[in-house]
Amino acid sequence: MLKSVAEIGVRAIYDKDDPSSNRPESFFENTSALRTEFAKLIGAPSERSCAITPSVSYALANVAKNLKAGKGDNMVIADEQFPSNFYAWDALSKERGITLKVVSAPDMIEGRAQRWNELILEAIDTNTKMIATGHVHWADGTKFNLAAIRKRADEVGAIVVIDGTQSIGALPFSVSEFRPDAVVAAGYKWMMGPYASGVSYFGEYFQDGSPIENNWMNRLNSEDFGNLVNYQEQYQPGSIRYEVGESANFILTPMLTRAIAQVNEWGPENIQTYCENLTTPYISELRELGVQIESEAYRGRHLFGLRLPSHMNMEEIKQQFAERRIFVSIRGNSIRISPNLYNLESDLERLVDSFKVMDHA
């Protein structure tokens, strides 16, 4: 977490000692500022097309509730995604009798990501109502071809739902380019915010939908505190209807706003370039040692997986990492590497040294 973000959080906690500075307008200025920064980050048409959602599972529950699908239809998802982007569809398939097509990665090394993308496109048919995937896979950084998925979805009348948690903030994303129907993102990852915070985009498909939660702030005219007991049937226009209760959260919301503002200032394209320039020489060294890494066209620069050659042992390489204070994530048989602006060449040198020791063992 950025120091400036932490400072805002600490200050907000102490502000609770004297809440007199909070005016009725503060509830809505807070949320508008956050939505505005997120809309800028993903190129959304307006802040009102975005909603503050505390988690991916919360946002996807809203998507699931409003998906127009039933028995005889199907949904297509990539396999081994983060659980939130499976459980929502697994539950919905059982509830409504919708077929859930889970597309696994092929058991191959060369061309694995390209073939996986092809398999996803092949799984989409005229009964498909939704495709749900990430921009990059959370375990190994496999990049999914969102433009091709959107094109195929248009051909069959399906919607596209993107979990952007592992990419938004570090990998450029454009609503106008990819035309997703929904984009959900947790704030604690590449947007560098606190836990229990996040923002989502809901497109035209969802603009007249029904949210999973009925709170006072997602109702029409909730800005008028004097008339809150004049209960409203109508929701706020746009995507704000899907916002979580207490979205004005005077601690988490300003923290995430500041974090995304900083990411916007840096620019995801610059972060991606920095990560590419930082890692490229060391990726070449790792490949020479037999480590398997996806081709550049089909992986993120900010997140990618390393798969060990047969003569290296996962438990032993983890020991090498521990000795060198290298912090990575093990996801199945993939070692997930996720650099950012705070990483230096010396970090990558220590990483490669761990593999060199194993290669000579």
Language model segments and positions:
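Pyridoxal 5′-phosphate
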Residues: 1-361
